[in-house]
């Protein structure tokens, strides 16, 4: 098997170019501006220039991907925190709503009892002494809280 002297010479030249390639660390390669990189790559073969530029692009993309992952994790944690806070608020509002419903039911019961009482008093006095339901409702004492409405409405 004969070795072509021309091809071995080309291989030797290629190895020499590789040996003359500036040894840049990954950090240095990424840290260079494009202008500085091009200045450092002057005199190298097109293949070496392409290889180094591709390596730089790969390293930069890797860094961008890592920072994107970190950002996504931080956003996810923040959203989970907000979700927990909102769930606590929903639970609190549900408890308040249930308490208000119980209070409303109790007030409805009192209102109906008073209306029944007013009807029985009116029936005992006769048709001439009918008491309007609104006048009965206005005499009901309510628990301290918001001021009673000036024009009370029926219980339903």
Swiss-Prot record:
Cell location: Nucleus
An annotated Gene Ontology molecular function: sequence-specific double-stranded DNA binding
Keywords: DNA-binding, Nucleus, Repressor, Transcription, Transcription regulation
Free-text tissue specificity from the UniProt record: Highly expressed in the lung, lower expression in the brain, thymus, liver, spleen, intestine, kidney, heart, muscle, and ovary. Not significantly expressed in hematopoietic cells.
Domain of life: Eukaryota
One family name in Pfam for this protein: bZIP_Maf
Region described as Basic motif: spans on this chain: 51-76
Domain bZIP intervals: 51-114
CDD domains reported for this sequence: bZIP_Maf_small
Swiss-Prot/TrEMBL GO biological process terms: in utero embryonic development; regulation of epidermal cell differentiation; skeletal muscle cell differentiation
Chief location bin: nucleus
SUPFAM superfamilies: A DNA-binding domain in eukaryotic transcription factors, Leucine zipper domain
Region entry Leucine-zipper, spans: 79-93
Record's GO cellular component terms: mitochondrion; nucleoplasm; RNA polymerase II transcription regulator complex
Similarity remark: Belongs to the bZIP family. Maf subfamily.
Role played: Since they lack a putative transactivation domain, the small Mafs behave as transcriptional repressors when they dimerize among themselves. However, they seem to serve as transcriptional activators by dimerizing with other (usually larger) basic-zipper proteins, such as NFE2L1/NRF1, and recruiting them to specific DNA-binding sites. Interacts with the upstream promoter region of the oxytocin receptor gene. May be a transcriptional enhancer in the up-regulation of the oxytocin receptor gene at parturition.
Subunit structure: Monomer and homo- or heterodimer. Interacts with MIP. Forms high affinity heterodimers with members of the CNC-bZIP family such as NFE2L1/NRF1.
Entry protein name: Transcription factor MafF
